[in-house]
Amino acid sequence: MLIPSKLSRPVRLDHTVVRERLLAKLSGANNFRLALVTSPAGYGKTTLVSQWAAGKNELGWYSLDEGDNQQERFASYLIAAIQQATGGHCSTSEAMAQKRQYASLTSLFAQLFIELAQWHRPLYLVIDDYHLITNPVIHDAMRFFLRHQPENFTLVVLSRNLPQLGIANLRVRDQLLEIGSQQLAFNHQEAKQFFDRRLSSPIEAAESSRMCDDVAGWATALQLIALSARQNHTSAHHSARRLAGINASHLSDYLVDEVLDNVDVSTRHFLLKSAILRSMNDALIVRVTGEENGQMRLEEIERQGLFLQRMDDTGEWFSYHPSFGSFLRQRCQWELAAELSEIHRAAAESWMEQGFPSEAIHHALAAGDAQMLRDILLNHAWGLFNHSELALLEESLKALPWESLLENPRLVLLQAWLMQSQHRYSEVNTLLARAEQEIKGVMDGTLHAEFNALRAQVAINDGNPEEAERLAKLALDELPLAWFYSRIVATSVHGEVLHCKGDLSQSLSLMQQTEQMARHHDVWHYALWSLIQQSEIQFAQGFLQAAWETQERAFQLIKEQHLEQLPMHEFLVRIRAQLLWAWARLDEAEASARSGIAVLSTFQPQQQLQCLTLLVQCSLARGDLDNARSQLNRLENLLGNGRYHCDWISNADKVRVIYWQLTGDKKSAANWLRHTPKPAFANNHFLQGQWRNIARAQILLGEFEPAEIVLEELNENARSLRLMSDLNRNLLLLNQLYWQSGRKNDAQRVLLDALQLANRTGFISHFVIEGEAMAQQLRQLIQLNTLPEMEQHRAQRILREINQHHRHKFAHFDEGFVERLLNHPDVPELIRTSPLTQREWQVLGLIYSGYSNEQIAGELAVAATTIKTHIRNLYQKLGVAHRQDAVQHAQQLLKMMGYGV
């Protein structure tokens, strides 16, 4: 819940001096990216900008305090301020900020700018007191903000010092409007106007000018002169002499003498007590100061000119001028030390009554009241956790003694979930074990079940599925239905374990249950996770169309709940890329993989390993080995500089082994095979993939017998567990083994099985990646004209893909190749004496690649009759009568040139 006063522009008071000369300068602010107003405290920065902002409807205002160094809090208020300025135009960004569903501040701002691209009118955001920001992450994000904000957007920053926002760069590019303390200082005319409005008796212009010079135009000093003159009934000139040459460091002494010592005791206590509030309203004042009518007292203090300012148009919220508020808080610690804890307790209670637990925690911490802090956390901690107020919660829990946590074990559970969210898995188990050992009496069964649900999540994250399953089952046996969050966690973990064990149908059922529960209780990250798992399971079962449709539901959920910046979004686009790759939609697959990398742009580079693997896969399917090698260099660098889950390594190894196969790099394959782990089982698609990598390397090295043993066992497991996509992949690799070992009939048999299974999976690229050996077999099958219609159609499609992406290596008779061929000493004499034209060589290459006459005509963009003429001519020159003879002739030429066909 946001405090309204932090988003309200200060109210313009009637007795303030209108700074016409500075307003004229600010009138051109829309021509600059940044308008920067800097000066020490008390020079009128806020007053000036509030005058300039008057009448501007499309302007947001954000008043900072020390608590805004929390990234999540900063983001929520900044987006809310822009929402006020735009009338709710940026709803997606607002939802992401409120639910903390963004990867970083920069990624949230990137989404904001996408929405603001549709906003075409001038727009302003004022950030007041930016000097309070000390968090370097926020500084970095605001530099990003300034670099990328729309041209019609102006950021206005008020600060006591030069902020770390890349000011020099903006200044050089003439994108910075600056107003500093020298310009903010009152001139003689403004000082005269000021005193005329504040003093009951007018003073001469010369005296006003002299006093202005004495304090160097410092607005706070002028205000103190007027206040002192009114309170003490002395001349303004006397006060001016006391203030001459004073600076902020000596201001405290002056404020004690001239302000605090000149108000009655009741007002003095009111000022000191109320100053602990960063913002205040009637209810807070009544509780903190004991005054019966807080609103009336605030208005009275305002009329006395005691540095109190309204923060909204309704006059409900107030705050002290920052310098005066800081001074009062310091005096409060000295003068009311014995009462200070009680004052903070009263503030915490009032904030709680108004529904602001974060502010209440701030005061409970300041009061050092562990019991109050505990009570606030017991009632509101889980809400704060779900809104990612993690830093505040961690600070609060550290402030509680361990004994207090033991007396309230749900707070121990909260601390453990905080550790889990930070991937501190070993600490989670240590904490829970210690708590169970030291909690006095019999531990509540439901709480124990919640502990087990969390432990189950930690176990599966840490790669221990057996322990995860045991704990998840224990949790589900004991958790009441009302404990929905822990039940969602335990059900999800159980489903994931069954996925790892190869029990796909039961795993799918549990993930569907998880989705239903998560949607019902608005636990959106688990709803998304369950959809991703369902899609993976359906892919493994060979139901790729069903997997596609599940992914569509996941994308819709991301859009509806603004989950675009969760790391899980990368998981979804990655499995979409895998599916697109399988269907040979390579451009779309590559785009999806790159969008996954973009989602992870603010994370460590190691997190991008899976998407980078897919980019290599796309290059390999296209036959672009140079690009694949470049990407592999980066991939192998990441592998050497991080620790990864076994399935991540298996996926990375897959593209490495395929690359070695395509380049004939037996040395690398042999070295890898010596060191790679050999899993004990192959009962899920992760382990199947690793064993398939091993078999592929063995085939490359000519180790056909051990490779066949591996593949036959993989097929047996895949059939029993219904891992149909893995079975399809295994059959293709077994086909290559039979083909290379000369067992042509066996090769044809398993290829027919693979083609039939592909009717279900839709696989294309898995065939294409095997290159010319696959193309030769498919040509033979097509020419036999015995394939069923669907298999015939798929075989032709695969041949076209191989021809498109691999023709340059095998079947593309370009000019350079033909020139080398004609100069070869073993070239047939018939070709040397009756050479083919360049077009006839192209036609021969396409015939060899399995193209029909119509397809050749389409490829070369000529009439079918022209193709028939070319074919008749090249048959005559080659001395052949039939198409199959031409294919065999082309194959002999390629072999002669050293191509392994």
Curated annotation (Swiss-Prot):
<keyword id="KW-0067">ATP-binding</keyword>
<comment type="function">
    <text>Positively regulates the transcription of the maltose regulon whose gene products are responsible for uptake and catabolism of malto-oligosaccharides. Specifically binds to the promoter region of its target genes, recognizing a short DNA motif called the MalT box.</text>
</comment>
<comment type="subunit">
    <text>Monomer in solution. Oligomerizes to an active state in the presence of the positive effectors ATP and maltotriose.</text>
</comment>
<feature type="domain" description="HTH luxR-type">
    <location>
        <begin position="829"/>
        <end position="894"/>
    </location>
</feature>
<dbReference type="GO" id="GO:0045913">
    <property type="term" value="P:positive regulation of carbohydrate metabolic process"/>
</dbReference>
<dbReference type="InterPro" id="IPR011990">
    <property type="entry name" value="TPR-like_helical_dom_sf"/>
</dbReference>
<dbReference type="InterPro" id="IPR000792">
    <property type="entry name" value="Tscrpt_reg_LuxR_C"/>
</dbReference>
<dbReference type="GO" id="GO:0003677">
    <property type="term" value="F:DNA binding"/>
</dbReference>
<feature type="DNA-binding region" description="H-T-H motif">
    <location>
        <begin position="853"/>
        <end position="872"/>
    </location>
</feature>
<dbReference type="GO" id="GO:0003700">
    <property type="term" value="F:DNA-binding transcription factor activity"/>
</dbReference>
<keyword id="KW-0238">DNA-binding</keyword>
<dbReference type="Pfam" id="PF17874">
    <property type="entry name" value="TPR_MalT"/>
</dbReference>
<feature type="binding site">
    <location>
        <begin position="39"/>
        <end position="46"/>
    </location>
    <ligand>
        <name>ATP</name>
    </ligand>
</feature>
<keyword id="KW-0804">Transcription</keyword>
<comment type="similarity">
    <text>Belongs to the MalT family.</text>
</comment>
<protein>
    <recommendedName>
        <fullName>HTH-type transcriptional regulator MalT</fullName>
    </recommendedName>
</protein>
<dbReference type="InterPro" id="IPR041617">
    <property type="entry name" value="TPR_MalT"/>
</dbReference>
<keyword id="KW-0805">Transcription regulation</keyword>
<keyword id="KW-0119">Carbohydrate metabolism</keyword>
<dbReference type="GO" id="GO:0045893">
    <property type="term" value="P:positive regulation of DNA-templated transcription"/>
</dbReference>
<dbReference type="GO" id="GO:0005524">
    <property type="term" value="F:ATP binding"/>
</dbReference>
<dbReference type="InterPro" id="IPR016032">
    <property type="entry name" value="Sig_transdc_resp-reg_C-effctor"/>
</dbReference>
<keyword id="KW-0547">Nucleotide-binding</keyword>
<dbReference type="InterPro" id="IPR027417">
    <property type="entry name" value="P-loop_NTPase"/>
</dbReference>
<dbReference type="Pfam" id="PF00196">
    <property type="entry name" value="GerE"/>
</dbReference>
<dbReference type="InterPro" id="IPR023768">
    <property type="entry name" value="Tscrpt_reg_HTH_MalT"/>
</dbReference>
<keyword id="KW-0010">Activator</keyword>
<dbReference type="InterPro" id="IPR036388">
    <property type="entry name" value="WH-like_DNA-bd_sf"/>
</dbReference>
